[in-house]
Amino acid sequence: MSSTMNPVAPTAHLASDVRAGRLDPAQYAKNFCDAHPPLNVVQANIEAERCYYCYDAPCQTACPTGIDIPTFIRRIADGNLRGAARTILEENPLGGMCARVCPTEVLCEQACVRNTNESKPVEIGLLQRHATDAFFEKPGTPLFVRAADTGRRVAVVGAGPAGLACAHRLAVLGHQVVLFDARPKLGGLNEYGLASYKTVNGFAQREIEWLLSVGGIEVRCNHALGRELHLDALAAEYDAVFLGLGLAGVNTLGLGEQAGVRDAVDFIAELRQAASPADVAIGRHVVVIGGGMTAVDAAVQSRKLGAEDVSIVYRRGQESMGASADEQSWAKENGVRIIHWAAPKALRAKGGVLRGIDFARTALEGGKLVETGESLALQADMVLCAIGQSFIATVLEDGGVQLQGGRISTDTEGRSSRSKVWAGGDARFGGRDLTVEAVEDGKQAALSIDRHLRAA
């Protein structure tokens, strides 16, 4: 095990030793610093010079928001960081966060032609961060100026990546936007759902402050659809409504209630909102169920909080995991064990205290997942569930919005079956759990809403 993760002092062996403050302050600071530091000026210039500036750039095609990647990299090479940032942010107003969290290895960097001969793409994500970081440190004059006020009002419900992108584009186009969110802070996944070491020093909120500075966006937090807000009332009051609700429902193990078992998303949110990581309790033996990015974030942060033994357990093989190969490698580098082909079957507790979790070994037979008859038992005083989330359709209150596969059905522009209502992000059928795709959903919906309002 890495020495950077060792507790301050050994404690008596207790299967239920779940507590905060396992490490000393210096170790917490080290563990939760920026996990992937930015390029310095020299590194950025060298990397920018590696770009071929392709005319028909496959990297741009692979970017869900269509950022003109060759242009922004050329501007970095020319020393024009503000121009580079503008090229990025005009297509992706959350370009700073996306530079930190995008799985570039399976998007733009995978498409880079440098892979053909060198097997090493241009580090597009780090270059994007270099440009946007420089801009946010010294924004100067506004990059974007609002068009003349159209007199139209649009309600945007949900201030995650899709809602923020939609609100920003609508405001730039001259519409008045009221941005609602159920939580005390804006940002959605970017604020509550990502590992703390991916976005340090409050960057998510700093980017949102810049996004709102364009003007024309009124913010109302602690307003949830189905609680303070109702779709019929919104449709009556506003000229258009965009639903960027995300996935608020949590899938459970179905093994009954047990202290020590909690949702991984809630665990990550608690850590992101904590004044200090020292305030967050963690077990000594942590098992994370799931195979996506959330599972990796929860597992790695468990190690960084001082857990001695952390395992990710996934019911299928490595190739089926939602977490990218880079994320899986990152987990292993941080001392996380990844176990494949095992499905949770029972929790073991004694005296109401979680002691472990039992698994059935699995395999594929005829394309179906089956149990092999073999078993696996792991010691655990904390189990984190990262087995997916679901859309809570009841918030729509039978408001005439058609669902498909449990999510909101839309056309290619984000229009729902109900007049005046658009949707995007994870709540839209076909949406993937990627910040950059949610941003594109919001942007395209805003353009569609704008066309609709101008034609009316």
Model-derived regions, located:
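Feature captures the FAD/FMN-dependent oxidoreductase FAD-binding
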Residues: 148, 153-157, 205-255, 346-358, ...
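Glycine-rich dinucleotide-binding loop and its adjacent helix/turn
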Residues: 130-148, 209-227, 250-305, 403-417
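FAD-site-proximal beta/loop scaffold in flavoenzymes
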Residues: 259-283, 367-432
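N-terminal Rossmann-like FAD-binding beta1-loop-alpha1 element of flavoenzymes
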Residues: 153-178, 295-303
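Conserved hydrophobic helix-helix packing surfaces used for dimerization/oligomerization
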Residues: 154-156, 177, 286, 310, ...
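Rossmann-like dinucleotide-binding cores of NAD(P)H-dependent redox enzymes
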Residues: 176-179, 183-213, 219-220, 299-346, ...
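Ferredoxin-type iron-sulfur electron-transfer modules and their immediate structural context
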Residues: 1-150, 241-260, 349-354, 380, ...
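Residue-level detector of alpha-helix initiation sites
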Residues: 93, 160-161, 185, 292-294, ...
